[in-house]
Design a protein with these regions (language model features):
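"…together with the soluble PPM/PP2C metallo-phosphatase catalytic core" -> "…together
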Residues: 1-164
């Protein structure tokens, strides 16, 4: 029941924040114009990531679990939201984005202990253990997911829909 409540609050607060932040973004010029791989029509406010992160954070707070287990994830997500907003406002170089994505992934893996330790039984010969490659592999996976999500954001709501 607690999980359903937390998910409901996360969804409702994210949706509400999108509506509120949309007006703010249009007012301050935090918008994306169509062109290139971006197929949307008109200027689109760039606030989906901030709204979804905030909604997720509200939901996590309602779980009443020890927040220490979420600290590294929340810090990494907050860093990515900040870097994404800075990139949307002023444009960061691909190298700078890669560095910050790596820092966020390392926050989760090194500080939070989150990682892919084994790949399962891929070859039918037993579990493939990553050992000392677990952190580098996880960092590469996280960076890959971040960039795949970013690349899918050329159509209105596609990245947000995939994330949900």
């Amino acid at each position: 029941m607690k999980l359903i409540l937390a998910c409901s609050v996360a969804f409702i607060s994210s949706a509400s924040l999108v509506l509120f932040l949309r007006r703010v973004a249009l007012h301050v010029g935090l918008v994306d114009a169509p062109g290139g791989r971006k197929q949307h029509e008109g200027k689109i406010p760039l606030v989906g990531g901030l709204a979804m992160f905030s909604g997720f954070a509200f939901g996590v707070l309602l779980l009443a679990e020890p927040l220490t287990s979420y600290r590294s994830l929340m810090a990494a997500m907050a860093l990515l939201v900040i870097i994404g907003t800075v990139d949307d406002l002023s444009g960061l170089s691909p190298f700078a984005k890669f560095i910050w994505q790596t820092v966020a992934a390392l926050l989760m893996t090194s500080w939070g202990g989150v990682g892919v330790a084994q790949l399962g039984d891929l070859l039918g010969m037993g579990q493939v253990q990553l050992g000392s490659w677990a952190i580098p592999f996880t960092v590469m996976c996280v960076i890959g997911v971040i960039n795949a999500t970013n690349m899918s954001d050329g159509l209105d709501g596609l990245a947000g829909g995939i994330a949900m």
